[in-house]
A protein has these predicted regions:
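Structured loop/turn residues at beta-strand edges in well-structured enzyme cores
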Residues: 1, 26, 79, 143, ...
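Acidic, histidine-bearing metal-coordination/catalytic regions of metal-dependent phosphoesterases
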Residues: 1-4, 61-63, 70, 228
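Acidic/histidine-rich helix-loop elements
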Residues: 4-13, 37-40, 65-66, 119-126, ...
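Active-site beta-strand/loop signature of hydrolases that rely on acidic residues for catalysis
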Residues: 5-9, 19-42, 76, 102, ...
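Structured beta-strand-rich core segments of catalytic domains in phosphoester-bond hydrolases
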Residues: 12, 30, 34-111, 118, ...
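Glycine-rich, phosphate-binding/catalytic loops in enzymes
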Residues: 22-24, 47-51, 93, 131-132, ...
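Active site of divalent-metal-dependent phosphoester/diester hydrolases
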Residues: 41-42, 55-77, 95-96, 153-219
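Active-site-proximal segments of metal-dependent phosphoesterases and phosphodiesterases across multiple
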Residues: 117-136, 155-167
């Protein structure tokens, strides 16, 4: 059984017309989206994905300071979500983080899907981000497991090295998952943005996968990533 998996930080100020067009045309089986803003009627991702036939789990993360909107993680599935849980991760006073877990029934086989968006550290080492990864690893299932999201960490970071010790990173070659035309962080080095990877799909050893694909959808400051898995 083959499944198309997509992970994308769609940016709370992204171009929703471009984002929704891509999501509609790509037709993934399971989708993890970061920076969903459910209380913004101009970009109602939840209603849009429901119309496409997805079940979903929503996990609020934090309040966007400039306008009071709620930024959330969201996981969507074309297959029945049998059980779900939102795991709280270590956080700061103003920046809450979590991981969504969904047990999904794919024609009689249960797969365990986790989606997260870790603390933004401007691509620098951070003990809170590292503790978030440690907490995530503790809750992971051992088999039939998919973990996806914006880890806000580069491949050489402690956080990603820890993930790779426990799961398979389907892409080991240097790639960028940031949109250099839109990614605008005054505290990040603009010279390395075109070669920076922050987004990942990890799998347990028992799941086969194709290569990582990076999508130039241009609606967000991150690029969508996908793979085709076989369970």
């Amino acid at each position: 059984m083959k499944l198309k998996i997509l992970s994308w930080n769609i940016w709370y100020d992204g171009d929703f017309e471009k984002i929704s067009k891509f999501l509609s045309e790509f037709k993934a089986d399971i989708v993890g989206l970061g920076e969903v803003v459910p209380d913004d009627p101009t970009r109602d991702t939840i209603a849009f994905m429901r119309k496409l036939g997805y079940q979903h789990i929503l996990a609020p993360v934090l309040t966007i300071q400039k306008d009071g909107r709620t930024m959330s993680n969201a996981l969507f599935s074309k297959y029945p979500i049998m059980k779900s849980k939102i795991h709280k991760l270590p956080d700061t006073k103003t920046d809450r983080r979590n991981a969504i877990q969904a047990d999904i029934d794919v024609k009689g086989k249960i797969i365990h899907v986790f989606m997260t968006h870790l603390l933004h550290t401007h691509q620098k080492p951070d003990p809170i981000q590292e503790s978030q990864v440690e907490s995530l690893i503790k809750i992971l299932t051992k088999e039939n497991t998919i973990v996806m999201g914006d880890f806000n960490a580069t491949p050489e970071s402690v956080a990603i090295k820890k993930m790779r010790e426990n799961l398979v990173d389907i892409e080991l070659k240097p790639v960028s998952t940031l949109n250099s035309n839109l990614f605008d962080c005054p505290n990040c080095d603009p010279n390395i943005i075109p070669i920076t990877r922050l987004d990942y799909i990890f799998l347990s050893q028992d799941i086969k996968a194709g290569s990582l694909k990076i999508h130039e959808a241009n609606g967000s400051d991150h690029l969508g990533i996908s793979t085709l898995i076989e369970i």
